[in-house]
Each structure stands twice: as C-alpha cells, then as structure tokens.
A protein has these predicted regions:
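Acidic donor-binding/catalytic loop of UDP-sugar-dependent glycosyltransferases
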Residues: 73, 122-124, 130-147
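Conserved donor NDP-sugar-binding/catalytic core segment of glycosyltransferases
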Residues: 139-180
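N-proximal low-complexity "stem/linker" segments adjacent to membrane-targeting elements
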Residues: 1-59
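A recurrent flexible, glycine/aromatic-enriched loop bordering the glycosyltransferase active site
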Residues: 184, 191-213
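Terminal low-complexity segments of carbohydrate-biosynthetic enzymes
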Residues: 276-395
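Acidic donor-binding loop at a coil-to-helix junction in glycosyltransferase catalytic cores
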Residues: 231-237
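A conserved acidic beta->alpha catalytic loop
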Residues: 35, 64-77, 97-99, 134
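Conserved nucleotide-sugar donor-binding
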Residues: 208-224
Length: 395
C-alpha cells in the first residue's frame, strides 16, 4: 500500500501501526533501491544484545522503514523478512515521492519526525538512525543507550567500511580514505585534549552521520529537528545540536559497517566522497586540508571563549577586556560582544563568531597537503598530551 504525504510532520505516516507501550527506542531507515543490502542490514536487529551479550528484549524497540521511489526488489525483500521475523516490530511504508521531495534530507526528516511523535506517546525515548546499506553491531542499541544513560543527549557511532567490499576499492581511493580518517581522528583527539569536554572525552572520534546516530526525544524537540535540506541533513542537524549546546558523544563502542560502493543513492555522501578521492588519484593531485596550526589556533581560542562564557556573569574581573584579548585577531563589534553576554547558548553565539574567524584563519594559515597536516597534527597531539603541559588560563 502506497502512502501519499506532503508535509514532514504528516500524522498519517506510520499512524496505522500499533505502538507497544514498552517501546523506548525507534530506529529509522530510509530505503531506495537497496535490494543488495537491506536483508543484511535488517538481520542483525533480530539478534541485538545488551552490553554483556544477553539477548535484548525485542519489545523495547521498533524499526520504521520508508521505502521511497524503489524500482528494484527492496520492498519485496523487506516484506519477506517481516514474515520470517514476526516478533521484530518492523513498520514499513512505501511511497513514490514527487521530485521536490525525492531526496534523502526530506525522507530522513519525515522518518525522524514520525519516530519523535510515536515516542512522545510513550513519554519519550531515543531516536536512532542508520542506512539501508549499513550493518550495525549486535550491541548497537545497547551501547547507544549506555552512552545516553551516562549523560549524552546524542550519540554518533563509529562508521567503518564493510570489510568484504574494501577489496574492491582501488588502492588510491582506499589510501586517501585511510589518511583522511587518520586526519579527522587526530583532530578529534586534539579537541578532547584542548577543549576537555566532559561528555566527550578520549577515546572519541569525529563522526556524527546518518550511518549511526541517535538523539533523545527531549533533545530533538529542543533543537527543532532536522532542517529542510536536500542532503547532508546529518551535518545540518548536528549544527542545530551545537547551537543548543547539546551533549553529543562520539563513541567508539557504538559501531556499524557501511557499504564501500562508489555509486550511491544520494547526491552527496560517502560514495560521493570515495569518488572524489578516486578522481584525485586519476589526476595525481594532492588533497589539501586545513593546517594543524589553524586547527590548534581555533581550538585554543574556542576553549578560552567557553571558559569566559561560563563566568560571563561574574563581576570580579573585566569581561570586555578579556573578551578582546581572546578575540584580538578577529574583527568583532559591540553587537557580537553583547550577544556573547546575553546568548542562552554558547554554541548559538559561537556559530556567528566562527564565520568571522574562518575568514581570518584562511588568510593566516594557508591550506596544506594532507601528508604534512598528519605529521603536524601528530606533533600537536604529543605536545598537548604531555603531563607537564600547562594550558594558559583566561584569567
């Protein structure tokens, strides 16, 4: 049965399906022509475990699947899987979207909204999302719940390439992918060392993407949900979470493996990035990235601004003078300073400051080749890891 809808919050979507009062987790999966992957993706949900390896109660979660514009056997495979696993609460909607809506941003938003409203009927819970070409770990749900119970508002899981498919990726593409991963992991390590964010300590990673992401209904509601974008909705949503100072945990214990295909289902995504790296190899061009010096400069300044923001209501020292000292390289004005004092969220204010900062940093620190950046980042990690290293106080 096909469902037609025009608004992301259309209450008719999935409304015909019963909701067990025990459900506290809803997983959403968008599907478009995933006949080669969807069965592997779904199979692991029938054998989810807790963190000790004991079977997870299937009554505690359900899976919402929106199959849109499929021209292959994806829907048949899903329905067949449903019949073979009647105890697994899989809710399937099938639709053909018009061109303006036939994009991953719209579909993911529709799914997340549906999950949010269903969970709110049960008093709230956790919305989780993955993809139709991705296989989650057996303890994926449990490890996510553990991170949220520890205080996180949202959890980004570690997304790895499917080992069986890596052998089919050309060596240059895999080479660049590995180096790019190392680059971002080193940045994540520096963020941990410099910012010392209590809810996202080392070991941590850099991914907060659709292959493995979770958010509490409370945080989802406060953030305003996923913005109206055609793609990269995960990045847009993460920005919204940053704006409300959400506690986002990048956990290595939450793991998935995703397809290494280079022909994807969205305009921009991992498959798109793999193709970019492949073309760089064909053209023998170097991958240019932000330099270690720029990254450290940005992180140290952000740390100092966070410290100042936390004491901005104090009267025992000159806030304005300290603010100007921290931001001396950045052209700030009185309006930006006053918004710093009054903003309810640091992240909301910092998003405005960051735009000004990026202009200056691009001029001061030219982009560098990836190999050099890796060398420099490793040096910075050693420096900031030293027990004797003393961070400069804003006071």
């Amino acid at each position: 049965m096909k469902t037609s809808f025009t608004e992301p919050d259309d209450d008719s979507l999935f409304s015909k399906f019963p909701l067990s009062p025990a459900v506290k987790v809803i997983i959403v999966i968008p599907v478009k022509n995933e006949e080669d992957y969807i069965l592997n993706s779904l199979s692991v949900f029938s054998c989810q475990t807790d963190v000790l390896g004991n079977p997870l109660d299937l009554e505690h979660f359900e899976i919402l699947i929106l199959a849109n514009n499929c021209t292959d056997n994806s829907v048949l495979h899903i329905k067949d899987f449903q019949k073979k696993h009647p105890d697994l609460h899989i809710r399937l909607e099938v639709t053909t979207l018009q061109k303006s809506q036939a994009n991953i941003g719209y579909v993911r938003k529709v799914l997340m909204e549906a999950a949010y409203h269903r969970l709110m009927r049960n008093g709230g819970g956790i919305i989780m999302t993955t993809d139709g070409d991705t296989v989650v770990a057996p303890d994926w749900i449990a490890q996510t719940q553990k991170e949220i119970e520890a205080g996180a508002d949202a959890v980004g899981g570690r997304i790895l390439l499917c080992q069986k498919e890596i052998q089919f990726v050309d060596q240059w593409t895999l080479h660049l992918h590995t180096k790019d991963e190392t680059y971002h992991l080193l940045i994540a390590e520096l963020e941990s060392l410099i910012l010392k964010t209590p809810h996202d300590t080392s070991p941590r990673h850099h991914q907060h993407f659709n292959g493995s992401f979770a958010v509490t209904t409370d945080c989802y509601g406060r953030s305003g949900g996923i913005p109206d974008v055609a793609y990269l909705e995960d990045c847009a949503f993460f920005e919204r979470l940053e704006h409300i100072d959400a506690k986002v945990r990048h956990s290595h214990k939450v793991r998935v493996h995703t397809s290494a295909r280079t022909i994807g289902r969205t305009e921009v995504g991992l498959s798109y990035q793999l193709n970019v790296w492949k073309n760089l190899g064909t053209e023998r061009r170097s991958l240019m990235v932000e330099s270690a010096a720029s990254i450290v400069s940005k992180l140290v300044r952000k740390r100092n601004l966070i410290e100042l923001w936390n004491v901005r209501k104090c009267q025992d020292f000159n806030i304005f003078e300290t603010f100007k000292k921290i931001t001396n390289e950045i052209p700030t004005d009185d309006m930006l300073y006053h918004s710093f004092l009054e903003s309810p969220f640091f992240g909301e204010w910092y998003s405005k400051f960051k735009k000004l900062e990026e202009i200056i940093l691009m001029k001061k620190f030219p982009r560098t080749c990836l190999d050099q950046a890796l060398v420099d980042l490793k040096k910075e990690v050693v420096i900031y890891s030293a027990p004797s290293f003393s961070q400069t106080s804003i006071r």
